[in-house]
Amino acid sequence: MSRIGKKPVSVPAGVTAAIEGKTLSVKGPKGTLSISLADEVSYAIEDGSISVQPINETKRARSFWGMQRTLVQNLITGVTEGYSKTLQITGVGYRANVQGKNLKLQLGYSHDVDFAIPEGITIATPDQTTVQISGIDKQKVGQVAAEIRRWRKPEPYKGKGIKYAGEYIFRKEGKKK
């Protein structure tokens, strides 16, 4: 069994972490993030690191241990480096562009799809078939990418649709006559 929770999370210079009640707040050069703390584990901030320990040896407490440590690590990475995902659009006439606070997608429907860009997320379209999503919250960046991809998932015959950069689409052969 993995014991990722044993490793303390180092807090780099320029980042401050504070525990107030049941909330851990992390402030860094890119912004501020916070999570609510689980009751199954205890947290300690000491000399430039945050350590997470289970309060008892139950299966539930041990399962929360590694997850909560990873969530703390994601907060620190988010406020220092940020997260980004890239989507590739494949298909004749499929394109995307940013117009103000909306992402306009042309995906072969009879109408254009307007996707409202949420707060804390930046979307850029370097070209018409590439969408770059970035932000400091890993969960929110992934959620926005999944919502955009949901409008036209890649199909296995021609590969048309929206896919993550680097994603492999399993291709099928068409019917034979």
From Swiss-Prot:
Role summary: This protein binds to the 23S rRNA, and is important in its secondary structure. It is located near the subunit interface in the base of the L7/L12 stalk, and near the tRNA binding site of the peptidyltransferase center.
Record SUPFAM superfamilies: Ribosomal protein L6
Gene label: rplF
GO MF annotation list: rRNA binding; structural constituent of ribosome
Subunit organization: Part of the 50S ribosomal subunit.
Domain of life: Bacteria
Protein's name in the database: Large ribosomal subunit protein uL6
One Pfam entry name: Ribosomal_L6
Keywords from the UniProt entry: Ribonucleoprotein, Ribosomal protein, RNA-binding, rRNA-binding
GO biological process: cytoplasmic translation
One term under GO cellular component: cytosolic large ribosomal subunit
InterPro entries recorded: Ribosomal_uL6-like, Ribosomal_uL6-like_a/b-dom_sf, Ribosomal_uL6_a/b-dom, Ribosomal_uL6_bac-type, Ribosomal_uL6_CS
Family to which the UniProt record says this protein belongs: Belongs to the universal ribosomal protein uL6 family.
Bilayer-crossing regions: none
High-level lineage: Bacteria, Pseudomonadati, Pseudomonadota, Alphaproteobacteria, Sphingomonadales
